[in-house]
Regions:
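Bacterial Sec-exported substrate-binding components of ABC uptake systems
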Residues: 1-80, 187-216, 315, 340-343
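A short, structured surface patch at a secondary-structure boundary
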Residues: 26-132, 137-142
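Extracellular/periplasmic catalytic domains that process cell-envelope and extracellular macromolecules
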Residues: 65-66, 130-131, 151-152, 208-211, ...
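Structural recognition of the beta-strand scaffold that forms the well-ordered cores
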Residues: 71-74, 91-95, 136-140, 157-160, ...
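Ligand-binding cleft/hinge of the Venus flytrap
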Residues: 87-89, 102-112, 151, 235-248
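Extracytoplasmic substrate-binding proteins
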Residues: 114, 125, 131, 135-224, ...
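Flexible, glycine-rich surface segments
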Residues: 202-292
Length: 343
């Protein structure tokens, strides 16, 4: 019978995941980030070579995933990026939201027919997913999430709740779990060690600056300004870069839905304004004002402190930032601390 005894695999920064290695399998528990004290999902990762031996001793209620996963459907671009970074791009047999994925190997694979486009992640093609015979489907959960027909196709759903971590390193550390899934545990541990080292070195560099600029992010969309919560990984990353996030006092780890007037009232004195833009051309000041006249009240708008990243210009921002926060942190330090003379 299953025993609680086993060797705990330490996660240094991630708060919502634990893993215990038992004889013949590894039990991974994902905490529910929306209901404190409850479990989102448990997985028993079983090497195929041990499947017969441990068949009767696995914990009840755990979703069994036979490892290494060699065929998968991946719903999110950050996880497509990670699998590629771990040398496991061949594991991706299907993906969703192809039009938003800025990864050459995925684009080539879909065009060549080696990777299937399974449609919109909110309403994917179940028939196409089933036809791929995946050994796991990597999905992005949300509060109260239901996966409809996906729950009934007999394929393990791996709920990628890493985005609910409250620190950038905590989110990135989930790569170690994904490494366990695909038989790239050593590679994932090595990559995370690089990310951690770079991140900490950059934090120390930021601390030497005399500047502590105030920062806001994002733009108005359909009359709403969506900002990262004060306890989100992005909010924490801005702080780690030696800046003051305008909503740092907020206690949420997800996104804030704010009236534009509230953002302007709270952050009109922000020195830096950062946002992502779609399309290949950066918006001009006139374009921004056509979107929302209130932007002209921002100190950053008037003072040249506006920085945009074009997600459709060959820059894989959405793909990389989750698991390579060290790269984004360095970009932030370059922006926030011109006194350091970084290029």
């Amino acid at each position: 019978k299953w025993s609680e005894n086993g060797d705990t695999i330490g996660f240094k920064y991630a708060d919502h995941i634990t893993a215990v290695r038992h004889d013949g399998y590894t039990l991974v528990s994902l905490a529910n980030p929306w209901r404190r004290g409850s479990v989102l999902h448990r997985y028993a990762l079983v090497p195929r070579t041990d499947s017969a031996r441990v068949a009767g001793s696995l914990p009840e209620g755990a979703t069994v995933v036979y490892t290494p996963v060699e065929r998968s459907v991946v719903f999110t671009s950050p996880h497509c990026f990670l699998l590629g970074a771990l040398g496991a791009d061949k594991v991706v047999d299907g993906e969703c939201d192809f039009g938003y994925i800025n990864l050459p190997y995925v684009q080539r694979g879909v065009k060549a027919g080696a990777i299937a486009d399974c449609g919109n992640s909110m309403s994917p093609s179940i028939e196409r997913i089933v036809s791929l015979r995946p050994q796991a489907v990597l999905v992005s959960p949300f509060e109260g999430a239901s996966y409809g027909q996906l729950d009934h196709i007999g394929v393990p759903l791996v709920e990628c709740a890493d985005y609910m971590e409250t620190s950038a390193l905590g989110r990135a550390e989930w790569m170690r779990f994904y490494g366990m899934l695909i038989g790239r545990e050593r590679e994932a541990d090595s990559l995370f060690a690089v990310v951690e080292r770079n991140y900490k070195e950059t934090m120390r560099l930021a601390a030497t600056s005399r500047l502590r600029p105030k920062v806001i992010t994002e733009r108005v969309v359909s009359g709403v300004w969506y900002c990262p919560g004060g306890k989100s990984s992005m909010g924490r990353l801005i702080a780690d870069a030696g800046a003051r996030y305008a909503f740092a006092a907020d206690g949420h780890s997800g996104s804030l839905t704010l009236a534009p007037e509230k953002v302007v009232a709270e952050a009109s004195d922000a020195d830096c304004w950062l946002f992502i833009y779609n399309g290949g051309k950066a918006p001009l000041p006139a374009d921004l004002l056509a979107e929302y006249q209130g932007y002209k009240m921002l100190k950053a708008f008037a003072g040249g402190g506006v920085y945009g990243c074009g997600s459709a210009t060959g820059v894989p921002y959405f793909e990389e930032v989750s698991f390579r926060p060290d790269l984004l942190l360095m970009d932030f330090v370059r922006i926030f601390h011109p006194d350091l003379g970084l290029k």
